[in-house]
Amino acid sequence: FGREVEILPVYRDRDARRGKNCERIRDCAAVYLGGGVADHLIEALAGSPALEALAAKLEAGGVVVAIAAAAQACGVEVRSVFGGRLIPGLGLLPRAVVETNFDPGHDRRLRQLLEGSPGKFGLGIPAEGALLLGPEGTFEAVGTVFRLSGPEADIEPLVDEPAADTPAPG
């Protein structure tokens, strides 16, 4: 594609405060956040200049792609791997909670996550689906992603379509 790829080593909070890393986030065309443990990513990025740079990138029309635990961390709250309690997410999807490796036939975890959080809707992302985050809470489903507008609502499939960070009407 004629693009240079660069790895930014943001593993700890001090990495997220490093000016050079924040400049690189601001200057690149797109950012990819890999999997891992959501708690660790949140711990490294919460309240940091790097998180501000990611949010600014989205607001300016840049692209942020997150998979697995990184996608979960983008929501308003996350289920911690340490005891299952709810912890604040990064808020890049400020009205949503995200469940990855989602199976619509087994949606109990997403419903419980949404019920216990300030999120207005839930997004279930199967292994073959993805979300591309955009400005002002917009996102685009790649493959099939599922939206749950409330803990008791029906699951709505979003298939390769743009959407907004608002619950479905109804």
What kind of region is each of these model predictions?
Residues 20-23, 56, 88, 115:
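Structural motif
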Residues 26-27, 60, 118:
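Residue-level preference for short coil/turn positions at secondary-structure junctions
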Residues 34-108:
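Class I SAM-dependent methyltransferase SAM-binding "motif I" and its flanking Rossmann-like core
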Residues 1-30, 34, 168-170:
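N-terminal beta1-alpha1 cap of cysteine-dependent amidohydrolase-like domains
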Residues 79-80, 84-170:
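C-terminal and late-domain segments of enzyme folds
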Residues 12-14, 71, 129:
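Residue-level detector of flexible, active-site-proximal loop/helix-junction positions
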Residues 6-9, 32-33, 64-67, 122-125:
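General beta-strand structural signal in soluble alpha/beta enzymes
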